[in-house]
Amino acid sequence: MGEWTILERLLEAAVQQHSTMIGRILLTVVVIFRILIVAIVGETVYDDEQTMFVCNTLQPGCNQACYDRAFPISHIRYWVFQIIMVCTPSLCFITYSVHQSAKQRERRYSTVFLALDRDPAESIGGPGGTGGGGSGGSKREDKKLQNAIVNGVLQNTETTSKETEPDCLEVKELAPHPSGLRTAARSKLRRQEGISRFYIIQVVFRNALEIGFLVGQYFLYGFSVPGLYECNRYPCIKEVECYVSRPTEKTVFLVFMFAVSGICVVLNLAELNHLGWRKIKLAVRGAQAKRKSVYEIRNKDLPRVSVPNFGRTQSSDSAYV
């Protein structure tokens, strides 16, 4: 149960930051109606799945062969695999968004430190720092020059007059640089566009996986679990009858998982409609345009090799004029 709790927390981390309202409803459906029910109820229902699959024969290996024929993949294992695969696009989106946030934080800190180191004398002295005249002004300026910048804070480093003057801290105020603000705004806009594009892509992949597992579940099990299964598979000598434990309960559980998968598909389509098919097309075209621009830049940066022309040169005496 601890593994499911970790997966639930990871999904909540992605949804709380970047998901839409429909995405949050979808997370509730996935967490409550899939993870919790499969982890708690499913293990109880399918605990004796193979041990209680009994065939009316004493032929060695016949029970195992017929069980493999009736259930190529156990219901509970199929649903666990479905949950993991369907949640994989969301986990990839979490990794991408966390990576982009870390990069944005590093850029912001580097911009602040560059601004701090650009003109420390001006920030320490400041306009009017030498004003006041006389010995009093020079003393104040000497004290300011003895301050040091530590992470954007001016800290007094004077050691000779500790008894007479207490340490003082002066917060350095940075004037916003117009070009820096424009660069930060552009980088933030690019980051938001990248995150939105990746979110749309993961919703599309998640919906494709939902539909694939829904179709696979239908072809593997149908809509019901029969109580009696007839089998003539080797090594059974003749056709034997096998009995499945709790067929009605398993049928209800199977139909319930069909309904949950159908609801997830509908919610994914509704989220894509909410995001807008036009935005999805623009996101795909934006990715293609970005790849094209990178290709053009690379071709432009490649050195051009001039090939000498060894053909005939035209002149007034040439016969080809």
From Swiss-Prot:
It is a multi-pass membrane protein. Residues 43-75, 221-252 are extracellular. GO terms for molecular function: gap junction channel activity. Residues 125-137 have a biased composition (Gly residues). Signal peptide: none annotated. It holds the Pfam family Connexin. The keyword Cell membrane applies. GO terms for biological process: cell-cell signaling; chemical synaptic transmission; neuronal action potential; visual perception. Keywords: Cell junction, Cell membrane, Gap junction, Membrane, Transmembrane, Transmembrane helix. Residues 120-141 are annotated as: Disordered. The chain crosses the membrane at residues 20-42, 76-98, 198-220, 253-275. It is found in: Cell membrane; Cell junction, Gap junction. Its main location: membrane. It comes from the Eukaryota. Residues 1-19, 99-197, 276-321 are cytoplasmic. One of its GO terms (cellular component) is synapse. Highly expressed in neurons. Belongs to the connexin family. Delta-type subfamily. A connexon is composed of a hexamer of connexins. PANTHER family: CONNEXIN (PTHR11984), GAP JUNCTION DELTA-2 PROTEIN (PTHR11984:SF32). This is Gap junction delta-2 protein. It comes from Rattus norvegicus (Rat). The gene is Gjd2.
